[in-house]
């Protein structure tokens, strides 16, 4: 490719995504991610997202783990919150109806096998209702609050794999559901923020991973699976740092950021991280912080085609972390926000266009009974109700 050309830049992004995912990615989905990505960034910028820019108004780009060049755009270290602020304002300004405190607990199909809506549960009143729809988009996020292998998580309380349960029970296929991303730098001290994300941007601006012997034992911007396994290895082999309460982790040498970038770099580039630690009297400009891997991202999910549609259930679309195949078995930094915007925006457009041609038949929940019959035939018993709308942290039910 012509170095510096638009296609060369996208080709390199494609190769980075494929390599980072151990070439288990679905090529068609990766192509869509990198081809539609620049237009989506421009769309967000036009909507008012306050991306980091230099004095001339050009967007600042940074490296992430496993990337061959700087390409990641950010809004300080709270890009997700800034994008959500902008999109929320857009929803309000356009008077788009939103049903709050209400979760989908079952998809509805018609006799032709098409998705036909969902059963909704009002989590305040306990009342059920039916939403009839010609197209449905599942965008329910991840599963970190399942706490696989007993790990802490950076995820919100609703990250309990609800969308995967809904889709699977209705007949949608799952892809790479065994693959979960452990972010290498989750907070392990203080305990009040156990599992909270220490963003990769901390390492992209200069912080090093250091073991108890003072050794920078690994490149800080390896892919996340490599860095996470490296942290665990150091702790398992006796080179971890003791943490109050009996846990172990490694140091993230944050003072190195200001040595490399100059005084004020931390407050300028990663202000949210600085505030989070200062809330507990820890000045990351002066002392390193202690970290350990945290459950962060669901690499697998529901199977979709290049247009975002389920390949098994007509008129069902999936976007964001609930979809599988885009990131293979390991996601690169920055690609989750890009993914949810590229495929979320696409899903909205495709759903709106498709519903004009859909004719629904009689609605039913036959697939739920069929699924229950399969469980009984297999002798599977469970004491949990799914989807699990909130994690089970109580010792016993009231």
PLM-predicted stretches and their roles:
Residues 166, 172-283, 350-357:
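An anion/pyrophosphate-binding glycine-rich loop and adjacent beta-alpha core
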Residues 20-60:
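Rossmann-like flavin
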Residues 1-9:
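Single conserved hydrophobic/aromatic residue that forms the stacking wall/gate
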Residues 105-121, 269-323:
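A glycine-rich dinucleotide-binding beta-alpha-beta segment and adjacent secondary-structure elements
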